[in-house]
Swiss-Prot record:
<dbReference type="GO" id="GO:0016740">
    <property type="term" value="F:transferase activity"/>
</dbReference>
<dbReference type="InterPro" id="IPR011004">
    <property type="entry name" value="Trimer_LpxA-like_sf"/>
</dbReference>
<dbReference type="InterPro" id="IPR050484">
    <property type="entry name" value="Transf_Hexapept/Carb_Anhydrase"/>
</dbReference>
<dbReference type="InterPro" id="IPR001451">
    <property type="entry name" value="Hexapep"/>
</dbReference>
<dbReference type="InterPro" id="IPR023446">
    <property type="entry name" value="CaiE"/>
</dbReference>
<comment type="pathway">
    <text>Amine and polyamine metabolism; carnitine metabolism.</text>
</comment>
<dbReference type="GO" id="GO:0009437">
    <property type="term" value="P:carnitine metabolic process"/>
</dbReference>
<dbReference type="Pfam" id="PF00132">
    <property type="entry name" value="Hexapep"/>
</dbReference>
<protein>
    <recommendedName>
        <fullName>Carnitine operon protein CaiE</fullName>
    </recommendedName>
</protein>
<comment type="similarity">
    <text>Belongs to the transferase hexapeptide repeat family.</text>
</comment>
<keyword id="KW-0677">Repeat</keyword>
<comment type="function">
    <text>Overproduction of CaiE stimulates the activity of CaiB and CaiD.</text>
</comment>
<feature type="compositionally biased region" description="Polar residues">
    <location>
        <begin position="187"/>
        <end position="196"/>
    </location>
</feature>
<keyword id="KW-0808">Transferase</keyword>
<feature type="region of interest" description="Disordered">
    <location>
        <begin position="173"/>
        <end position="196"/>
    </location>
</feature>
């Protein structure tokens, strides 16, 4: 793993969390229980504090950063999609930030909210609970339905389960030269399917 102390501050990672070896954690970073940090994620706590609360996931290629004297927070069971950028913001409990979205300084995403993929949330935005946000700049278009929240929670559970799966079986290896006969397919732990 790539952990770096910065000006005397060392990242804190709960023993039940999984941090991919290619992720980078610098300085004032706090990672809670059962958190998943994906490949190539960058959590750069060299100005403000970065906090990833229990059960949350920060997926591949995400960036977290913030300003001095601020906390950038992903709340409990937060779900941060591939390539998202979080800068000096707060993501509420059980919220989802879609792939390649950008959440700017001082923005607050409400609990159980969903930010659609490729959205841009402006600095200082203050959302409410259970909003569907989308666009550039993002705006609330409606409330998150019970079905959508259930779908979000199933996806988050997949990542929570992936933590244990990675601890048990992920390791560096050499590639095969050809595909083996009857190669098995990997399965998830829930019945979640892509939202259409």
């Amino acid at each position: 793993m790539s952990y770096y102390a910065f000006e005397g501050l060392i990242p804190v990672v709960h023993p039940t969390a999984f941090v991919h070896p290619s992720a980078v954690l610098i300085g004032d970073v706090i990672v809670g229980a059962g958190v998943y940090i994906g490949p190539l994620a960058s959590l750069r706590g060299d100005y403000g504090r970065l906090i990833v609360q229990a059960g949350a996931n920060i997926q591949d290629g995400c960036i977290m950063h913030g300003y001095t004297d601020t906390d950038t927070i992903v709340g409990e069971n937060g779900h941060i999609g591939h390539g998202a950028i979080l800068h000096g913001c707060v993501i509420g409990r059980d919220a989802l930030v879609g792939m390649n979205s950008v959440i700017m300084d001082g923005a607050v995403i409400g609990e159980e909210s969903i930010v659609a993929a490729m959205s841009f949330v402006k600095a200082g935005f203050h959302g409410e609970k259970r909003q569907l946000l989308m666009g550039t700049p993002a705006r609330a278009v409606r409330s998150v339905s019970d079905d959508e929240l259930h779908w979000k929670r199933l996806n988050t559970k997949e990542y929570q389960d992936l933590v244990g799966r990675c601890h048990a079986s992920l390791h560096e290896t050499q590639p095969l030269r050809q595909m083996e006969e009857n190669r098995p397919r990997l399965q998830g732990t829930t019945d979640v399917t892509p939202k259409r």
